[in-house]
Amino acid sequence: MSMTRRLAPLIAGFAATFAAASPVQAEKLRLALQKTGTSGWEMAVVKAFGLDKDAGLDLDVVELASPEAGKIAIQGGSADIVISDWLWVARERAEGAKLTLYPYSTGVGAVMTRDASIKTIKDLVGRKLGVAGGPLDKSWLLLKAHALKQGVDLEKSATILYGAPPLIAEKALQGEIDAALEFWNFAADLEGKGFTRAIEIADVERALGAKGDVVITGYVFDDGFAAKNRDALNRFFVMTGKAKALIASDDKAWATAAQRIGPKDAETLAIYRKRYVAGTPKRSVAEEEADAAALYRVLAEIGGEKLVGPGKTLDPATFYKGAEAAKH
């Protein structure tokens, strides 16, 4: 018997032992996510249900205090993926950056009020309206544009108060303003306290040319990173899609997510869940891009270069096209 034949079983055994001791290493993705955002809900569910392991991913998640910190992280190269909005991505691309976005949420807010007489844009004339964010907040600009099409200049015909979302919510609760244009989660809080959703920003979007619920935020990453990590990104999108589905349908998953919200009564938590589920993207990237382009034109017209930068139309590479198979 030759030496090779005598050693064959030993070599085979060694190879099997080595393979068993050296599993395929999970691919690492660095995420920088806002601590209070719904992405934190999803990451909690991902960990609790082992979805990251199923996807062969090693997630390095850094929690941030604000969306602005995420922008700094992706620009500085300290994160592979952050969450931001397509308007910011489009502006960055217009200024030379190579960022792109994959749909995350269509969740938008509403004009919230306790006053049953406020039901339409025209009912805001002569009223005090709180606006979460500032004069260049996207929802506010869209609301202004929609009002102008109806012959109403809200800046002239209503008293506008700008402020951070918590401040505007507090002013609404104290009765210091007649209505509040709030982000979706603060709108959910007010809804739980008896406020009604007088004007849906999703309806405003449709009135301005959108065909459906428009993605507002997305996973943002660099073109170069996407080219080198396409498969890992696809698995990441499938994984987060599973987390979204679990939060929608599985009470254990929802309980895991709800722990991230803080103390809320059961009715408010149910509203949070309902609004979160409603914000899950359901359309193709092409459909999302078409609607975003329509709204971009409106925003560019009313917000000008201060809002959109030098780009007059939506950059066609704003939305990432490499993961259609990962749509959930």
Residues covered by each model-derived region:
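Short, solvent-exposed loop/beta-turn-alpha elements that line the ligand-binding surface or hinge
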Residues: G50, D54, A202-G212, A278-E288
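Bacterial N-terminal signal peptides that target proteins for export
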Residues: M1-I11
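Conserved C-terminal helix/tail region of periplasmic/extracytoplasmic solute-binding proteins
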Residues: A293-H328
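Pocket-lining segment of extracytoplasmic ligand-binding domains
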Residues: W86-W88, P166-Q259
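Secondary-structure end/capping motifs
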Residues: A226-E305
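Sec/Tat signal peptide C-region and signal peptidase I cleavage site
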Residues: A20-A26
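Bacterial N-terminal signal peptides
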Residues: P9-A19
